Amino acid sequence: MNMAVFLDRAGRSVGGRPVITVGEKTHSTCAELAGRVARIAGRIRDRLGLAPGERLALVMKNCPEFIEVLYAAWHAGLCAVPINAKLHPREIAFILDNSGSRCCVATPDLMEAVGPLVDDVPGLERVVS
C-alpha cells in the first residue's frame, strides 16, 4: 500500500474537508485533491511513458502543485525523487544522474535552470513543468 491509497480513502470518506490551505484560503478539499492526483497520475503514465517502479524527479518550490505531483507519482506507482529547489544546477544534475530519474517535473520559474540539464544528464529524457 502506498500513500496515494490513503488520499483516495480520505477523498471518499471526508471529501469535503480542507486538505491544502494557502494562508487563509482553502486550495483543495480531500476529494478535489484526490481527483487531481488521479488525473495527473494518468498524464504522467500516458505522456511521460513512465511505468511503475521508475523514478520521477521533482524540482519544485513549496507550492500546492508539489503535493499534487508527489501524490500523483505515488498513485502511478513511481518512486518520487524530491530535490531541493534551492540547490545549484550542478548539484541538481548530480542527484538526477545518481537517482536514475528518466523525467523531472519543475515549477515554471525553475525551468530556465533545470530544463537544460536534460543535455547534461545521460539518463534524463525530459524536464516538464
Place the predicted regions along the sequence by residue.
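Structural core segment of the AMP-binding/adenylate-forming
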Residues: H75-S129
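Generic signature of intrinsically disordered, low-complexity, basic-rich segments
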Residues: F6-L7, D97
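Conserved AMP-binding/adenylate-forming core of the ANL superfamily
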Residues: D8, G16-C63, I67, Y71, ...
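Conserved donor sugar-nucleotide recognition element shared by glycan-biosynthetic enzymes
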Residues: M3
